[in-house]
Amino acid sequence: HAKDVVFGGEARARMVEGVNILANA
């Protein structure tokens, strides 16, 4: 789970941003 520690925050933020864009479309 080292990758989750390194990339988790940024990847999760990007994914949430993408979901919000789709939800607002």
From Swiss-Prot:
It is found in: Cytoplasm. Its EC number is 5.6.1.7. Keywords: ATP-binding, Chaperone, Cytoplasm, Isomerase, Nucleotide-binding. Its main location: cytoplasm. GO terms for cellular component: cytoplasm. Forms a cylinder of 14 subunits composed of two heptameric rings stacked back-to-back. Interacts with the co-chaperonin GroES. Belongs to the chaperonin (HSP60) family. This is Chaperonin GroEL. It comes from Delftia acidovorans (Pseudomonas acidovorans). The lineage of its organism: Bacteria, Pseudomonadati, Pseudomonadota, Betaproteobacteria, Burkholderiales.
